[in-house]
């Protein structure tokens, strides 16, 4: 009698582990999405750091919120919340000498990737650090976040 219950328990446990365990293809997909996010963030940062950017000093006056801790994909919620202000600052800075092509598309791509990576169920309330960050610091920290997560996946 107990033997049947034990076998049922083992079978259910195996089914649960098999269905919930991440597969190598899902890890690869996550890694690719993070790499795309990383490239988009680096593209924005490179455009801002361009030596011909006369609006950089103005851009540095805008402050962005950073999470106290960003170590998991769910923390991308905090990046998502700052995308609109980021887009607004980038649009303000557009000029003849400084032009990020398709800022709206870049931000939209980042938003789509972030939503896929963090999952739709995430309702994390971001705990922000007391100090704010400049646009350069903001982008550098999220770039470092992506690199860190990618390194754990490989």
Curated annotation (Swiss-Prot):
Its keywords, alphabetically, are:
Adaptive immunity, Cytokine, Disulfide bond, Glycoprotein, Growth factor, Immunity, Secreted, Signal
> Gene3D superfamilies in the record, alphabetically?
1.20.1250.10
Q: Where is the signal peptide?
A: 1-20
- CC annotations in GO: extracellular space
Q: Where mainly found?
A: secreted
Q: Which GO terms describe its biological process?
A: activated T cell proliferation; adaptive immune response; cell surface receptor signaling pathway via STAT; extrinsic apoptotic signaling pathway in absence of ligand; interleukin-2-mediated signaling pathway; leukocyte activation involved in immune response; negative regulation of B cell apoptotic process; negative regulation of inflammatory response
- State whether keyword Lyase applies: no
Q: GO MF terms on file?
A: cytokine activity; growth factor activity; interleukin-2 receptor binding
InterPro entries recorded: 4_helix_cytokine-like_core, IL-2, IL-2_CS
- Subcellular location per the Swiss-Prot or TrEMBL entry: Secreted
Ribonucleoprotein as a keyword of this entry, yes or no, is no
Name the cystine pairs: 78-126
Superkingdom of this protein's organism: Eukaryota
What are the annotated glycosylation sites? 23
Biological role: Cytokine produced by activated CD4-positive helper T-cells and to a lesser extend activated CD8-positive T-cells and natural killer (NK) cells that plays pivotal roles in the immune response and tolerance. Binds to a receptor complex composed of either the high-affinity trimeric IL-2R (IL2RA/CD25, IL2RB/CD122 and IL2RG/CD132) or the low-affinity dimeric IL-2R (IL2RB and IL2RG). Interaction with the receptor leads to oligomerization and conformation changes in the IL-2R subunits resulting in downstream signaling starting with phosphorylation of JAK1 and JAK3.
What the record says about family reads: Belongs to the IL-2 family.
Q: PANTHER family in the record, alphabetically? A: INTERLEUKIN-2
Which protein, by its recorded name, is this? Interleukin-2
Taxonomic source organism: Macaca nemestrina (Pig-tailed macaque)
Q: Which gene encodes it?
A: IL2
